[in-house]
C-alpha cells in the first residue's frame, strides 16, 4: 500500500474514528461476560480501527505508530487463554472455574470483574494479532 496523498480529510477523520472505535471496542470487551460482546467482538473492533489507520495512511506509518509484531500478540493471547482456565487448578477447583472479584476505584464504587475477563483479554489479543497479521501480509505483498 502506497501512501495516499491529498487525503487530509480522510486522514484526520480516520484518527477521530480510530479513537471512537477503540473506546467502543473496549467498552464491549469489558461488558462482554455479562452482555453480548467480549474478547472476540472487542478484538474485531480494535483490529478494524487499526485497519482504518492503515488504509488512511500506509503500512509504514502504521508500523511506526504501533511498532510491535502482531504475531507475538497472538502468542500472548493464546498464553492468556491457556493460563486462565489452568489457574483454577492451583486453587483445587475444576478446570475453567471462574471467580468474581472487585477492583477498588477510590471514591467511585468498586468495579466488579470476573476471572473470565483475562480469558476474554487473551481472545482479544489473539483476534487482533491474527487479523492484523493477515491484513498486513496481504498489504505488504502488493
Curated annotation (Swiss-Prot):
Entries under Pfam families matching the protein: MnhB
Transmembrane segments: 12-32, 37-57, 70-90, 118-138
A GO molecular function held by the record: monoatomic cation transmembrane transporter activity
InterPro entries: CPA3_antiporter_subunitB (IPR050622), CPA3_sub_B (IPR005281), MnhB (IPR007182)
Subcellular location: Cell membrane
Biological process, per Gene Ontology: proton transmembrane transport; sodium ion transport
Topology relative to the membrane: Multi-pass membrane protein
Cross-referenced PANTHER family: NA(+)/H(+) ANTIPORTER SUBUNIT B, NA(+)_H(+) ANTIPORTER SUBUNIT B
Similarity remark: Belongs to the CPA3 antiporters (TC 2.A.63) subunit B family.
Name the UniProt record assigns to this protein: Na(+)/H(+) antiporter subunit B1
